[in-house]
Structures are given as C-alpha cells and as structure tokens.
C-alpha cells in the first residue's frame, strides 16, 4: 500500500496578497489564503466573497430554451408528466424539487425513482413503456438519462415526450430529445452543477417564463443545498451560492421531514453547515436507495404528515446503521482480498476487487475507503450469478471515466464521472476487466506521486 502523506504549500507572492488586502478590503490571513488558492484579481475576490454574478442565465443551460416551452405546453394542457429520478441523495432531491415546482405551476406530475436492484440506474426502455401504459405523456429525467439513447428512441416511437436533465458525462452520441445539462452545447458558464442543481436551473427558467411567483424557487432551494453537498460537487461559483441560500432555508425549518430527520441525526438546524449535510443528512437519505428503495427518502422530503415524517426518519436512521455495518464487513473482506493479490498485481496502479455476497448498494462507499488505504483508483464488483454490479472511485490524478472507457469492450454498461462511476460486467469478464483496468491505470499514473496532499 502507498503510505505517508506529502505536504504541499502553494506559493503566496506577498505583492499579490497585499494588493488583495488593500483593494478588496480583507484581512491579511484571508488575503494570503486566497492568494495561495490562485486568486489575484481584487474584483474577482469581491465577487467570490459577495457571490455577486454567481447565478447564471438558465436559458444558456443546454436545451433549456427548447425544454421550457414544452413544459409550459404540458402544464397548460394538463399533460401527465413523470419526473424520473435516481436513487441517491442527489437524484431524490432533484425528483422532489421538480415535482414540487411543477405542481406549484399547476402541472399534473408524479415521481418515479427506479430500484437499484430491479430497474437499475438510468432511464430504461421498459420504464418508458411502463410509464406510457400508466398514461404518462411527458417524461423529465433528473440526475440521469444522458446516455439513454434506446429509451429516448422508444419514447419517440410511443409518442411520449422526453426532456433529459443530467450532469453526468455523455458518450459520443446523445439521445434524440432536448437535453438540459452543463456538458451539452457548451454555452453554460459553469460545468459543475449536480443533478438537483441542473433541475433547479430548468425550474428557474420555467418559473420566469410562466411569470410565476419566484417563491416557488425559495421552497425548493433547501433540496438543492442538500444535493450539492451530498454529491460532492465543487462548492464554488453557482454551487456555492445555491448551497449557501439552501442552508439558510434549512435553518428556517420549512420542510417537515427534513426537520424531523435533523433531530434524529442530532443536528441543530439553526447552525447547520456543509459538514452536517455531508456526514449526517446525506448518508441517511442515501441509505434508502442503497439498501431498499429510495421512495422512503423521497416521501420523507415531500411529506406534510408529522406521523409519517417521524416513521420515515426513523426508518432511514435504521437503514443507515445497517449500511455502516455492511460497509465495515465488505471493507475488511476487500482489503484482505487486496493483500492476497500477487505482488505484481499490487504493484499495478489500478484495482478491481469482486466477490459474491457484497451488497451492490454499498460497494461505492467501500471503494472510496479502499482508495484511501491503497492510493489507487478502485472498482468493487458485487457478483450475483453471471453478472456483477460495480462502483468505482478514483484519485485526483486519474480520470475514472476514461479508465472505464478503455475497458468498454468488457463491460455491459458503465458511466459516471472522472471521480466516481458505476459498471455492470459479466462475471466471466471480471478477470479480464481487472487486468485491462490495472494496465491502463498503471500507464496513466506511473511516475505520479499518489500520496495524499496535506
């Protein structure tokens, strides 16, 4: 294992820090810290501290200018709309906020979140057919869908409208429908929104187009803050502004289910911060989709019934305790498996570990902990019969998405980000996948100092 840490101190040119101190009107300690982080323009520093200019025009976000009139038409015609989300905290928050926002605008809307263990990740052809049979005539995805080409084609065949909102990386081809995503069209000035942040920007544009009361946006900004922090997107630019506003809203105690969950998690809403969301709230919301079905988390966020809120918050708290126990067991087994690898495999700079009996909803968090120990990009695969469901985590120096692309011929499905991704692989291909991934990672990381930076 790679051990030890390296100390990296960014330079602080005294002239730059002094200029920031004087022209931005800030203290020397803050000026030094900002200089070390690359800030040099007093005007930029002032905008960063006041967050002026951090909120961007939603019409620049992918195909938002096309999607918004489609939504307006669906609302006016009372077209049945389904918001198709994902089972993590970001996806659940995005589903809740868009359902609440559309309902406030008069839409006939229902949520749909797939099961991790049945439908799996993303918009599936079967889901499109099921929603069509249930009367849905417009599907809006949140936090997923950017690679769902077959599902988009099936929606078109059935006459079901489709709008995709997503923040994940896409392949060479895109689904044939309006796509609202920071990575699409290249016109949006900020590329690191989470799924809920992306859905919020679409709602922001829709509220303006409908000339509706902007308090609709205030009512869901708390969900954007939770998702932004829980999904670990950078807290800069628009993310920072949205998270700050959302944390303030949480402190006002406006969402019943969240208020109850905070009490159970022993978090004081009046002084809530990103740490409390990341370590107390996010894991409890994620636990539902990891171990059972994310509907419990969604219902908690949307309920107005005190009894239901208490029951659901207790359920999520119990699931989170179960998740921790399962996680600890898998971590022990994964590290033992790594230690049993031949020395030549341990020397390679990419790791794939797999086993029967591992919980597919937990392997992602365990992969993060393995990365902390071995300092290599790691994919953990939970085997179930002839297929395995895996999740990977990476280091700053390695693009996991590109690493999986190098193994695409061995994978059934894959997708995600530079730092985190998911895979489906046939059991018979796991060994070949492990070799190919390790070889690619070794090629890309040879000579790179993999010790964590302090």
What are the language-model segments listed below?
Residues 2, 10, 14, 19-137, ...:
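Hydrophobic helix-and-loop "lid/oligomerization" segment in the mid-to-C-terminal part
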Residues 5:
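Catalytic domains of riboflavin
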Residues 131-134, 141, 145-233, 239, ...:
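Conserved phosphate-handling catalytic cores of large alpha/beta enzymes
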Residues 447-449:
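Short, structured loop/turn "capping" segments at alpha-beta junctions
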Residues 451-454:
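Short, intrinsically disordered, charge-balanced linker/junction segments flanking boundaries
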């Amino acid at each position: 294992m790679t051990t030890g840490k390296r100390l990296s101190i960014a330079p602080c040119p005294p002239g730059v820090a002094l200029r920031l101190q004087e022209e931005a009107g800030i203290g020397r300690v803050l000026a030094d810290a900002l200089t070390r982080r690359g800030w040099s323009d007093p005007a930029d520093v002032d905008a960063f501290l006041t967050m002026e200019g951090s909120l961007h025009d939603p019409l620049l976000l992918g195909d938002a200018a096309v999607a918004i009139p489609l939504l307006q038409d669906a609302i006016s015609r009372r077209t049945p709309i389904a918001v198709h989300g994902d089972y993590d905290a970001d996806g659940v928050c995005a589903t809740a906020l868009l359902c609440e926002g559309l309902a406030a605008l008069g839409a006939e809307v229902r949520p749909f979140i797939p099961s991790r263990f049945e439908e799996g990740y993303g918009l599936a052809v079967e889901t499109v057919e099921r929603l069509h049979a249930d009367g849905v005539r417009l599907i809006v995805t949140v936090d997923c869908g950017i690679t769902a080409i077959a599902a988009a084609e099936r929606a078109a065949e059935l006459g079901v409208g489709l709008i995709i909102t997503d923040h994940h990386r896409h392949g060479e081809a895109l689904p044939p429908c309006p796509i609202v995503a920071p990575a699409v069209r290249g016109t949006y000035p900020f590329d690191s929104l989470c799924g809920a942040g992306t859905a919020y920007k679409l709602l922001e544009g829709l509220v303006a187009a409908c000339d509706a009361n902007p308090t609709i946006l205030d009512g869901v900004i708390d969900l954007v803050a939770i998702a932004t922090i829980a999904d670990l997107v950078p807290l800069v630019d628009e993310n920072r502004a949205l998270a700050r506003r959302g944390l303030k809203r949480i402190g006002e105690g406006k969402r019943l289910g969240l208020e109850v969950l905070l009490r159970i998690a022993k978090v004081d809403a009046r002084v809530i911060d990103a740490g409390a969301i990341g370590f107390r709230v996010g894991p409890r919301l994620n636990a539902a989709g990891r171990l059972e079905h994310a509907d419990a988390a969604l219902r908690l966020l949307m309920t107005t019934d005190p009894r239901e809120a208490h029951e659901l918050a207790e359920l999520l708290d119990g699931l989170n305790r179960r998740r921790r126990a399962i996680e600890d067991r898998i971590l022990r087994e994964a590290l033992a498996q790594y230690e049993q690898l031949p020395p030549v495999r341990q020397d390679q700079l990419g790791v794939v570990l797999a086993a029967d009996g591992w919980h597919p909803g937990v392997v992602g968090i365990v992969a993060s902990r393995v990365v902390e120990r071995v300092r290599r990009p790691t994919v953990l695969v939970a085997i179930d019969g002839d297929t395995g469901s895996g999740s990977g985590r990476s280091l700053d120096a390695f693009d996991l998405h590109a690493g999986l692309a190098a193994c695409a011929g061995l994978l059934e499905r894959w997708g995600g980000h530079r730092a985190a991704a998911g895979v489906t692989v046939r059991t018979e291909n796991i060994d070949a996948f492990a070799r190919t991934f390790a070889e690619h990672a070794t090629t890309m990381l040879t000579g790179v100092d993999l010790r964590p930076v302090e």
